[in-house]
Amino acid sequence: MKDWLDEIHWNSDGLVPAIAQDRKTGRVLMMAWMNREALSLTASENRAIYWSRSRGKLWRKGEESGHVQKLHELRLDCDADVIILMVEQIGGIACHTGRESCFYRVYEQSGWKTVDPVLKDPDAIYPAGH
C-alpha cells in the first residue's frame, strides 16, 4: 500500500504550499509551507504544524501566540501540489500582524489598501525579541 505522503508532489526543496482556511466561514487565513514531517505531524496531532523556511525548523502554529489552528480536514488539490487545511482558528487571529487573516490587503486602483483591522497588537501577542 502506498504511503499517503508519497502522493504529494513536493517541490525541489521538499516542501508543499499549505493554505489554512476557516472551516466555518471559508475565509482563507494564511499560506505557509510544510515538509513531509510537518504534514505527517499535522495529521497525527490534529493541529497545524508548518515548516519555517526562515528559522529552518518545524513551527507549531500558536506555540508562542496561543493562536492554534485545530485541524478538521486536510485536502489535496488535483495536481497533488497544494494542501488545504480546514481549521478552527483558536483566538480568531491567524496573522502575525494581529489580524484574522494574512490576506488583509485589497488591490484598488494601482495600490494595496489595508481593509482588515488589527485585532490585537503583535507586541502583546509575542514575547520581546520575536
From Swiss-Prot:
Molecular function GO labels: magnesium ion binding; phosphoribosyl-AMP cyclohydrolase activity; zinc ion binding
Substrates-to-products reaction catalysed: 1-(5-phospho-beta-D-ribosyl)-5'-AMP + H2O = 1-(5-phospho-beta-D-ribosyl)-5-[(5-phospho-beta-D-ribosylamino)methylideneamino]imidazole-4-carboxamide
Binding site for Zn(2+): C78, C95, C102
Keywords: Amino-acid biosynthesis, Cytoplasm, Histidine biosynthesis, Hydrolase, Magnesium, Metal-binding, Zinc
Pathway in which this enzyme or protein is active: Amino-acid biosynthesis; L-histidine biosynthesis; L-histidine from 5-phospho-alpha-D-ribose 1-diphosphate: step 3/9
InterPro entries cross-referenced by the UniProt entry: PRA-CH, PRib_AMP_CycHydrolase_dom, PRib_AMP_CycHydrolase_sf
Main location: cytoplasm
Cofactor section: Mg(2+); Zn(2+)
Coiled coil: none
UniProt signal peptide: none
Function: Catalyzes the hydrolysis of the adenine ring of phosphoribosyl-AMP.
NCBIfam families: PRK00051.1
UniProt record similarity statement: Belongs to the PRA-CH family.
Protein name, UniProt field: Phosphoribosyl-AMP cyclohydrolase
